[in-house]
């Protein structure tokens, strides 16, 4: 737990120590233990890869690599230079609903009309949102700016086109790797499901490393944190109601709107995993 920079990992129980490669380098009071071979006690290797600066770990050694599955997705966002991001601040929440409630809420703008009438809806009209076709385990929600002539709040990364700098994007690599992207700022929603009816959430505010040199960097981070919190508080109230409805005895399946195409895409992916 926590964040560290160490050359050895030491178990707090019996003080066995391992190097960063997972090799056992110290095992106190093991002299005389018959058949004890330190080389046979190395830590197991967890499969991992680095994608656009994110370290992805997978306990299933048989799963296909991540990057080839999201090549089109990666090209869609290549101008945003995701690998240049740093985590400027992290917001933490606990929620009493299934993680899929959050993902579905994140990936459609239809609810802007009712949930965000004074925040998102005036800036990104629900009716203008669109979801491109997907060729892999991912989905992208593109929300064009309702005010395309207004300048960007933050200086955009070099090479970003005007529409990329002003429009808002939500994306998911299934099942729940969520990124909210606008210009130079990215919100990474990191989900930790705790069961069918709860999750922990960390919202990481990510900004380009070069923006850290700005004199008003702290104000930028604070302003982003306040806005992200305000939006999420609006979503919390909505998701609480959604969960109450989903767990009610008379709940049935409704019809998706064309604006909820991303949810449909996730459902198709889910069906593929189940067959």
Feature-to-residue mapping (PLM):
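C-terminal catalytic domain of Rieske-type non-heme iron oxygenases
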Residues: 49, 54-275
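Rieske [2Fe-2S] iron-sulfur-binding domain
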Residues: 1-61, 67-72
